């Protein structure tokens, strides 16, 4: 039997490809004609196309018309020197909205005209900035809620009492007006009560939790009530380590997210909600002013096939009083952001037509195996 000979350099090429595929950033090689000569696995995911498909097209087919990336490529070819460009907008129907990236473009000296491009998505850093904005907004609601509880609820109780007294002495035609006064005061009191949740800054007990037990419990509540006609399925990572959190608050978070998904789906017959969990070890956040990095490897998602969130609303979705619901208060998602932020995590939303995903990223609990039960989770199956 004759063994296949290895061509000179073939082993080195295989090693180079293995190294490039191990990089967690999208990397592509563009040849002298502008065609994609190589794309690593992350680039396939980034562009939503296979390496073979990418290789049959000019790079301009995959980025927005007039993108500054094309200018950078020409600049690197002319100067034969690498450049860095920050916060380049590659937003497009193909790549999605809010696609900000940092770019590193370098010449391949052994192949004149060819350049290698490394993409570093800015989305995570920008999401952290938005989370800080959400927390500041929640703090402003906290102060407002404390003031409203004292300055508004007390007078409202007097107004409602007076309306009830009037109701006993007016004719039937005017009784509807006194009833309206009572109903509206009740509505305002209910709104203030919901806002008072923001002013509760008491420390909460946290324990290592099995997130799947929490999600199953929330699913059972949803199927018994508002989501009884909607298919809810799950795709869990069984090896997920525990999350260090307060169980009641996590139930509140995911009950809110699943209810939002159910309301978005409405009465459509093919409505479906998908719950997923995953371990993403590559997500690490820098802490301002220190060398510390926080790892947020636990990813919990609520997906739905509703109509999607309006693009103009998406950047403000977690701000207080933002809602598309006729009778909504706009406080549910703001509370979700406050709770998750208080646990050291972040929450984000990605929405396109017929597909919306709410993604919660949280730190893992230290010192417990993934399958170890805790007092908070033992025996909890929803």
From Swiss-Prot:
Domain PAS: residue ranges: 14-81
S-S bonds: none
Protein name: Sensory histidine kinase/phosphatase NtrB
Function: Member of the two-component regulatory system NtrB/NtrC, which controls expression of the nitrogen-regulated (ntr) genes in response to nitrogen limitation. Under conditions of nitrogen limitation, NtrB autophosphorylates and transfers the phosphoryl group to NtrC. In the presence of nitrogen, acts as a phosphatase that dephosphorylates and inactivates NtrC.
Segment forming the signal sequence: none
Stored SMART domains: HATPase_c, HisKA
GO cellular component entries: cytoplasm
KW Nucleotide-binding (keyword) present: yes
């Amino acid at each position: 039997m004759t063994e296949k000979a290895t061509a000179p350099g073939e082993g080195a090429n295989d090693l180079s490809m293995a190294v490039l595929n191990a990089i967690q950033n999208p990397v592509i090689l563009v040849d002298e004609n502008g065609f994609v000569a190589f794309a690593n696995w992350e680039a396939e995911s980034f562009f939503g196309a296979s390496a073979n498909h990418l290789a049959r097209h000019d790079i301009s087919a995959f980025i927005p018309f007039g993108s500054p990336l094309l200018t950078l490529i020409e600049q690197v070819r002319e100067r034969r020197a690498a450049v860095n460009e920050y916060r380049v907008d590659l937003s497009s129907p193909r790549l999605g909205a809010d696609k900000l990236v940092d770019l590193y473009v370098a010449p391949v000296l052994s192949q004149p005209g060819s350049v290698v491009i490394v993409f570093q998505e800015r989305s995570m850093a920008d999401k952290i900035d938005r989370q800080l904005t959400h927390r500041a907004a929640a703090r402003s609601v906290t102060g407002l809620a404390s003031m409203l509880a004292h300055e508004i609820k007390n007078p409202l109780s007097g107004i409602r009492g007076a309306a009830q007294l009037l109701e006993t002495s007016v004719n039937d035609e005017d009784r509807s007006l006194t009833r309206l006064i009572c109903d509206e005061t009740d509505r305002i009191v209910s709104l203030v009560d919901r806002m008072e949740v923001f002013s509760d800054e008491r420390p909460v007990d946290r324990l290592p939790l099995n997130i799947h037990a929490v999600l199953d419990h929330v699913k059972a509540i949803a199927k018994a009530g508002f989501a009884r006609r909607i298919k809810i399925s799950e795709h869990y990572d069984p090896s997920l380590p525990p999350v260090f959190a307060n169980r009641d608050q996590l139930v509140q978070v995911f009950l809110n997210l699943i209810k939002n998904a159910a309301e978005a789906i409405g009465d459509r017959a093919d409505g479906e909600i998908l719950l997923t969990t995953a371990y993403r070890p590559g997500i690490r956040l820098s802490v301002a002013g220190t060398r510390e990095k926080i790892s947020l490897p636990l990813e919990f998602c609520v997906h739905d096939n509703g109509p999607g969130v309006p693009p103009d609303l998406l950047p403000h979705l977690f701000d207080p009083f933002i809602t598309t619901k006729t009778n909504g208060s706009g406080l549910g998602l703001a509370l979700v952001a406050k709770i998750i932020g208080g646990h050291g995590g972040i929450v984000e939303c990605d929405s396109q037509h017929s597909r919306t995903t709410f993604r919660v990223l949280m730190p893992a609990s230290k010192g417990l195996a993934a399958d170890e039960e805790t007092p908070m989770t033992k025996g909890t199956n929803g």
